[in-house]
Amino acid sequence: MQITDAIADMLTRIRNAGSAKHESVDIPASNLKRSIANILLEEGYIKNFEEISDGKQGVLRVNLKYNNKQNVITGIKRISKPGLRVYAGKDQLPKVLGGLGIAVISTSKGIMTDKKARVEGIGGEVLAFVW
């Protein structure tokens, strides 16, 4: 199956699995998705993730995190889409919920959060908001 927007597919799978109270969700693997999963892990939005080799593309198994039977990820939204790219300079980087959430940014130095991009002093493409 051809997926037009792989990042939106990943975020939707995580959102749906959280709504259905699933323990984990399987996502087709790629370097970009691995980087996004790593950011979600570092920021405490997921328990962990592992890469499962299937002889082809591979699969990322993301284990979701719950707090009192409530999903830790309250909201997850794709911002920059294939039809409408959204870029932000170092001075225009968005804050999600006044700093309580994170923005995932694709920069020239790799995928990082908005906080890290501010420290590095670089802008980039705003991939998603997570809160």
Curated annotation (Swiss-Prot):
Keyword Ribosomal protein carried by entry: yes
Taxon lineage: Bacteria, Bacillati, Bacillota, Clostridia, Eubacteriales
Quaternary structure (record): Part of the 30S ribosomal subunit. Contacts proteins S5 and S12.
GO MF annotation terms: rRNA binding; structural constituent of ribosome
SUPFAM superfamilies in the record: Ribosomal protein S8
BP terms from Gene Ontology: translation
PANTHER family in the record: 40S RIBOSOMAL PROTEIN S15A (PTHR11758)
Pfam families: Ribosomal_S8
One GO CC term on file: ribonucleoprotein complex
InterPro entries: Ribosomal_uS8, Ribosomal_uS8_CS, Ribosomal_uS8_sf
Sorted UniProt keywords: Ribonucleoprotein, Ribosomal protein, RNA-binding, rRNA-binding
UniProt keyword annotation of Translocase present: no
Protein name in the entry: Small ribosomal subunit protein uS8
The encoding gene: rpsH
Family per record: Belongs to the universal ribosomal protein uS8 family.
Function: One of the primary rRNA binding proteins, it binds directly to 16S rRNA central domain where it helps coordinate assembly of the platform of the 30S subunit.
NCBIfam families (UniProt xref): PRK00136.1
